[in-house]
Amino acid sequence: MGLNLLKAGFPLTVWNRTKAKAEPLIAAGAKLATDPRGVAEHADILITIVSDPQALEAVLFKSGALVALRQGATLIDSSTVSPDLARRVAAACAERGVDFLDAPVTGGTWGAQKGELVFMVGGKAEVLERVKPVLEAMGKKFPLLGPNGAGQTVKLGMNLLLALQVDAFAECLALVRGAGVPAEKLMEVFQASMARSGVLDVKAPMMVKGEFPASFPLRLMHKDVRLALELARERGVKLPAGAAAYETYSEVLSSSKDDPDFSAVVRFWKQ
């Protein structure tokens, strides 16, 4: 995302908890700040993308990044967090005269590299219109889904769907293998069937091979399903399939000694 902003000609100042992760951006022309506040204090637009709600609160509130933003600046958060946290950030921004969009992304590493991410946006239309040139450097679609919190709501729904699809294929694979049919035969049919999907086109071969390079880590998908279940409980919505999948992901996460892709949920049937 940062490299695409630089390619589009935007001046960029960055910070990362792990300095090595920022080195490609620095080599490409970005400036390195010593802390989040140092990024925010001169920014017209501040983009945050961190791993979980705790990290976002640490960056925005504990580090002082939010209070360092000047009046009239815009904060875009592309992390995946709860809608409630997005609304709390929006309220804190409003108190300081800062505009806010919750804009989590989908598209994975490939989409980020190609500049073809989809931003799921919650906030005001006029704010989205103003920052659209920045988003266009990183993505291809920016639907406005509603007020602040709507972007995070849709993102949690989408990731729940991805988690369920991969979990369902893992069960399918376990059944077919357990009944004595090679996985390769299943793949012949799967790839010509209506069961195909974008995520399974990528993840199913990984699951058959038992190789799980972390395009989207299991620990992050586990977090996102948990957030979806928490939102469902708050709203009185029953998610029986989501709850069952969460237990499966939880067991695999606790027993995995590496940091695998979420397609490693298939390990549940090999334990």
Question: What are the residue ranges of the model-derived segments?
Answer:
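NAD(P)+-binding Rossmann beta1-loop-alpha1 motif at the extreme N-terminus of oxidoreductases
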Residues: 1-48, 68, 72-73, 78-79, ...
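Residues in the short beta-alpha loop(s) of Rossmann-like NAD(P)-binding domains
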Residues: 17-18, 52, 124
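Active-site-proximal catalytic alpha-helix in oxidoreductases
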Residues: 115-122, 143, 147-179, 188-202, ...
